[in-house]
Structures are given as structure tokens and as C-alpha cells.
Amino acid sequence: MIDLSLNRRPARSARAERVSMLPQLAAKAQASGVETALRWHANETVSMTMRQGVLLANQRARSSGISARVFRNGAFGFAALPDDSADALDRALRRAAENAELAPRAGAQPLAPAAPGRGLFDYRRTDARKFTAAERVELFRTLDAAIAAKYPDLVTRDLNLTLFCSEKALATSGGAETFSAVPRVIFHVSLALEAKDGIVDLYDAMGGFGEIEDHLADVDSLLARIDALYDDLRRKAEGAFCEAGPQDVVLDSNVAGILAHEAVGHTCEADLVLAGSIAGDRLGQRVASEKITLGDFGGRGPDGRSSFAIHVDDEGTPCADTLLIEKGVLKTFMHNRDTAQRLGAAPAGNARAFAFSDEPLIRMRNTCILPGDDPLDDMIGAIEHGYYFRRATNGQADLTGEFMFGVNCGREIRNGKLGRALRDTTISGVAFDMLKSVTHVGPTLSWSPSGWCGKKQPITVGMGGPAIKCRVHVGGRS
């Protein structure tokens, strides 16, 4: 058996109670006589919103329950109940077995073998006093008052906080036994002011892996980030629109990370490959510049600094690192045990479920372009006429690899130097074409603090990368 217990911590009584469920889950899974995964799963979210000094929302939500997933004669059966009693566990297991009997069968092939993942991975703090609800409100009031006093020209100022923690105990008939609790903080500051031609806004996301004490305890640091955000907003209000058409650009790490996830990562998920993804018939082919190596990683990513952590997936498979593209060549896809068997690959721990009532799907974990050795100044200096895009907003990509994303912060590049700030624009293209155009890859890997993915179920992910120089289609004014 593989022992993945990388983060053992003294447990509080509630944690000990959840960890103590593992032997019961394991005993029932192993006594089932078929491939079985039993999971207790709880998600807790605290959210706060303040606008113009008025607290609009301050709430806590929690969902928890038990699920059973059975694989029998080539078909899965799944059942879930919002209860964690022994009786609920038996009922869920029985219903899952019944559902497996009723499911359509395309064949009776087995699941790909996988070593059982084991370990305790509780990342919640035990060494410091927690912020109380009242202290969180007071922090918001302090920040809002400071913003209002320093920047009276703002027409709106919004503060949004989300504290999220996913906690689960999982055991399988194959011997996997694992408990995890992974917290994350997302703090958004959005500012707007009036320019000559209308309202201009800009936001920044802070936080990441851990709890509020890890990210929001230093008010001076937060205010410094807000000062930088205001400076960017002021320049943007006086900024220029992009020229439309194909352009040489530098994508900062925030934009490169989203593209790695949305435009490339999804095309390499094996269920979408089977559905006709553009990546499906390109294994072993060059799909990117030799400077591009792109992977999906377990743990907290290759540098241990992602905003998300995962060591064992929801099928009980240990999370191994996967290089999807290596030096420009497409090497493999992301799998669960079912698609790994169908496509002759090894599962690496990509089966994930967002809530107790969700069945695991093939999902990304920590997806990023690995850093190179090209300084940012060299990228900018290599462009005569183009743009430096720093922050991406909403966007979309499809199975053909075509993408379009909004960009809300950037600068002109003229004769190898940064010029005017930019207004909102869009970038679009085909992912593999864009990656083939990459000529520079920066040396610094950074991660979005707020990565989420919405493939049927929302789920936390890590999205990262260095800055890259490439060519994309830019929206704007001719």
C-alpha cells in the first residue's frame, strides 16, 4: 500500500470523530464483494459582501452527507444521502448496488488497477486563535473606511470574502483510506470610478490556500495591494483601446494560467477526449512550441505553492503528477479508472466530486505551464507593436480548443517599452495554435488565488503559469 500521509496534525475532537469513521467505511467497502467507494463529505462556506460601507451579506452554509459508488459487471451505481449515520451508510450502499444493476452496460471490462491512496491531510490551522465573525466584519469596516477616506473619487467600492473548506473521509474496497480537509480564502476588492466616457472598474483577488489568518491578518499589506489596484484603475480610466486583429502579446501569469486550464486542460480530459476533443488524435504530435511543458499536478503543484491541495482522488487513487505536454509534444490525458482502462493508460488521481451528492468526474487539479528562463523585460523588449495583458476575467473554451477571454488590465507595448494603460478587451484563438506561437516563457510560476472550474459541478482547482510571449487575436477598435 502507498502511504501518502504528508501532513499529519494533532486533531481536534470533531476531526478525530471524522477520522474515526474511516475504519467503519473501510469495513463496509471491503465487505461489499464488489468495487466500492464510500465517502463522507462536507463543504462549508462563509461569505461576506460589503458595498459602500454597507454589509449586504454575512452568512455561513454547510452541506454534508454520505455517498456510495459501486462498480458491478461493467456499470457504476451511485447513491447519496444527507446523513452520516450507520443506517444511512447501509442504505446508500444498498441503493448504489441496485442502481448498478439497472445501469446500461456497454461491456463488462474491469476498471484500471490503481494502488490505494492512504493518509491524513488536514490543512486547517490548529496553532492560532480564529477570527470571529465580529472580527471579520470589523476588518471589512476598517478596509472600507480607509479606501473611502483615501480615494473619494471612487463611485463604487466592493469587498467580497469567501472562506471555503472541503472535508472528506474516503474508503474503498481496494484498501484506500484517507481523510482530508482543505481550506481556501478568496478576497475580492472591486473599485470603480468615472472616466470621461463612462464608468471604469477593476478588481483584484487575494488570498489562496489556507485560512483567513494566513492571508488577511496584516491590514497594512492589504491596503498596499488596494493602493496598487487604485493606481491601475486610474491609469485604465485614462487608457486606450486595443487595435483589433492578430497581435504579438505578453500574457502575464494570471492570463497564462487560465488559458492552461480552460483552453488546453479541458481538451485533455479523457471523458471529453472520448466525446471528440481536438486533442484526441494528437498523442505524440507537436501541439506547442518546444518551450511549452504543461502539466496537471497533485499535492500543491510542482512548487508546493498552489491555492489548492489534493493527495488522493475520490476513487481512492493516489494523485500523481501528469505532464500533458512535454517540450511541445502531447504526451497523455487525464483519467479516471474507467477511461484509463478504455484507453490503455494509468490513472493518476483525477476523479473528483464537489459535494457528497456528486459522482466523481474527471477533473483537473493543479494545472500550469512550467516556467522557463526568459525574463519579462526580454519579452516586452522583443515586441515592436503589441500588448502586455495582466489580468483575465470571464471567458470560455470548447472541445475544438477555440477560446475567448476578457482582459481587464494591461499596457501597450511600443518599440519594446510599456506604454499607455488599456481599457477592457478580449483575446481569442485556438489553443494549440497559440501555444505553437510561444517564443518566450518566464522564470516565475505563480498561481491564481481563486481558481474554480464549472464542468457540470463547481470545484476548486489550481491554475498557474509564468508569463509567456505569444500571438493571439485581440478585440478592439480598428
Where are these regions (language model features)?
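N-terminal small-residue-enriched
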Residues: 1-478
